[in-house]
């Protein structure tokens, strides 16, 4: 597995949006869907069930992928794909 690193921007946005590093790592390791949006940049997403809200959401993770690492650029929640 490649090393996963988080940019300062990603960490700030994840805190603001209530997304944990654990959730992001889980999505990177087992994404429901992955799309390359430009060379080296991918968006990975997975459907998550929020037990407290009893709702289904998607978490999207944007990352720059290199030979040795995955650098998380940002992550956010959305209600649809």
Predicted segment positions?
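Ribonuclease/tRNase effector modules and their secretory precursors
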Residues: 1-81
């Amino acid at each position: 597995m490649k090393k996963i690193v988080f940019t300062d921007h990603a960490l700030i946005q994840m805190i603001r949006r209530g997304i944990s590093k654990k959730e992001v790592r889980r999505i990177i390791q087992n994404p429901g869907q992955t799309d390359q949006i430009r060379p080296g940049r991918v968006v990975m997403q997975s459907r998550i069930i929020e037990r407290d809200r009893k709702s289904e959401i998607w978490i999207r993770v944007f990352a720059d992928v290199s030979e040795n690492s995955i650098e998380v650029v940002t992550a956010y929640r959305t209600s649809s794909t």
